Design a protein with these regions (language model features):
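Conserved, structured core segments of small domains
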Residues: 1-123
């Protein structure tokens, strides 16, 4: 089963400490080597590059960041191929433990979502 983990936090924290980047890189290396992590990526703050395209009352609007009204913004993601939801939660907990250890005072969350299996298009 494929799962996506989505890390969210307040935008005002700035960039993570280098020690956290290093620890996340090591965790990612291990998960990639054992075949459980398929993809991962971090996102720049919305004040650097952030745009929202929205439909509201049938109208499309485009808004440039930063998004002052947002309580949390997505900071990154990972896609895993795992056997169960429990394994996905374990991966998220390990990731959050690194934040707790290397970025004291940071507050945020990691959301775990199972991905849909989409059938291939028919010819």
């Amino acid at each position: 089963m494929k799962f996506m983990t989505i890390v969210k936090g307040k935008e005002g924290y700035g960039f993570p400490p280098q020690e956290l980047f290093d620890a996340i890189a090591e965790l990612g290396k291990e998960a990639t080597e054992d075949g459980t992590m398929l993809s991962t990526g971090g996102l720049l703050p919305t004040k650097i590059v952030g745009v929202r395209v929205r439909i509201d009352n049938g109208e499309i609007t485009v808004t440039d960041g930063p998004f002052a009204e947002a309580k949390e913004v997505v900071g990154g993601f990972a896609i895993f191929d795992l056997k169960s939801k429990e394994e996905a939660v374990e991966a998220a907990v390990r990731f959050m433990e690194l934040h707790k250890k290397y970025w004291p005072g940071w507050e945020g969350e990691t959301e775990v979502r199972q991905m849909m299996d989409v059938p291939p298009p028919t010819a």
